[in-house]
């Protein structure tokens, strides 16, 4: 196979042997599309592309589980935006599903034939089913931290009704680090990774709060981190495969449910720890830092009908080649 990687920011990509990087909607992008046999995306299909006979369109989707409402099920979705669903999704040959709840709810939300759903689990999550010391080393080398340094990943999600430029009171992240360092006798850092739709900046003077967006691969950060703090980001599904603690900001969950899209699965049934707000994080993080939630998460995966087994890439390749 000839592999083409499409991005809006080719200058940020690490060059790898056998992979050509092109800018989205550039002349090279359209030329290469004309001769590609398989087009893979993690969202909608670019409306500027005209599908040729014999081409395969596949989406891996960008969120695991089936937490946030999508498609026609959304509460405040723009009607013009919603009118484009058919144009974006009806051309799909395959939709990769992480769990039975995803198949059931997304088929209805996007009016898709259930036959196109590949119930394989998510390719990006295969890494959580085996040991990858090289991933940890990559992250540690990038941020110049030692093997003993612990990582708290702070990864808030996108909310349409939130201010265009949102700030969190990062004093509580600093306090959390102080408390964790005192309790564990280890050094800690925070990687602050904002959603790419939202301009959130790290204006902390604390040198232990680092730019999580500077690193190119979110799954590497999830694999390497010891704790995850978020609001309603679907990365909770991915991180739960590690069995490590997930902390949710409950005030943001309530806002999203009442003012934005809402949830397919009520958030009070999720197995993750809930902080009233970011001010409650220091106490919660210290209390639950060493807990193993594997059993609790396993029950949740069973309820959702998880397809995650660590073999998604292998299964999808077999389907595409046959």
What is each model feature region?
Residues 1-131:
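Active-site and donor-binding regions of nucleotide-sugar-utilizing enzymes
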Residues 1-3, 90-95, 188-190, 224-227, ...:
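Short active-site oxyanion
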Residues 9-12, 44-47, 63-66, 100-103, ...:
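Short, solvent-exposed loop/turn segments at secondary-structure junctions
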Residues 22-37, 191, 196-237:
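Donor nucleotide-activated moiety binding/catalytic core segment of transferases
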Residues 38-61, 66-68, 215-260:
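A donor-sugar binding/catalytic signature common to diverse glycosyltransferases
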Residues 123-203, 275, 312-314:
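Conserved catalytic-core segment of nucleotide-activated headgroup transferases in glycan assembly
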Residues 204-205, 234-305:
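Catalytic binding pocket for nucleotide-activated donors in carbohydrate/polymer assembly enzymes
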Residues 309-322:
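C-terminal alpha-helical cap of glycosyltransferases
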């Amino acid at each position: 196979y000839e592999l083409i990687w499409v991005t809006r920011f080719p200058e940020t990509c690490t060059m790898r042997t056998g992979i050509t990087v092109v800018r989205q909607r550039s002349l090279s992008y359209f030329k290469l599309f004309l001769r590609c046999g398989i087009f893979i995306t993690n969202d909608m299909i670019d409306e500027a592309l005209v599908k040729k006979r014999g081409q395969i369109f596949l989406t891996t989707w960008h969120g695991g589980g089936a937490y946030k409402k999508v498609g026609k099920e959304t509460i405040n979705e723009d009607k013009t935006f919603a009118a484009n669903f058919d144009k974006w999704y009806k051309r799909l040959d395959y939709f990769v599903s992480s769990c039975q709840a995803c198949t059931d709810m997304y088929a209805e939300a996007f009016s898709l034939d259930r036959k196109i759903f590949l119930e394989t689990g998510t390719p990006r999550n295969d890494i959580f089913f085996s040991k990858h010391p090289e991933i940890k080393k990559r992250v540690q080398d990038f941020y110049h931290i030692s093997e003993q340094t612990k990582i708290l990943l702070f990864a808030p999600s996108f909310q349409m009704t939130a201010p265009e430029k949102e700030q969190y009171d990062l004093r509580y992240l600093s306090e959390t680090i102080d408390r964790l360092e005192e309790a564990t006798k280890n050094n800690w850092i925070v990687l602050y990774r904002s959603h790419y739709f939202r301009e959130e900046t790290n204006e902390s003077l604390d040198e232990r709060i680092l730019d999580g967006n500077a690193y190119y691969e979110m799954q590497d950060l999830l694999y390497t981190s010891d704790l995850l703090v978020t609001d309603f980001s679907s990365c909770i599904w991915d991180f739960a495969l590690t069995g490590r603690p997930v902390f949710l900001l409950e005030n943001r969950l309530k806002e999203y449910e009442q003012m934005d899209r809402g949830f397919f699965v009520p958030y009070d049934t999720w197995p993750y720890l809930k902080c009233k707000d970011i001010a409650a994080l220091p106490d919660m993080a210290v209390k639950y830092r060493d807990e193993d939630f594997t059993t609790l998460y396993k029950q949740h995966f069973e309820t959702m009908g998880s397809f995650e087994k660590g073999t998604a890439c292998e299964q999808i390749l077999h389907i595409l080649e046959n």
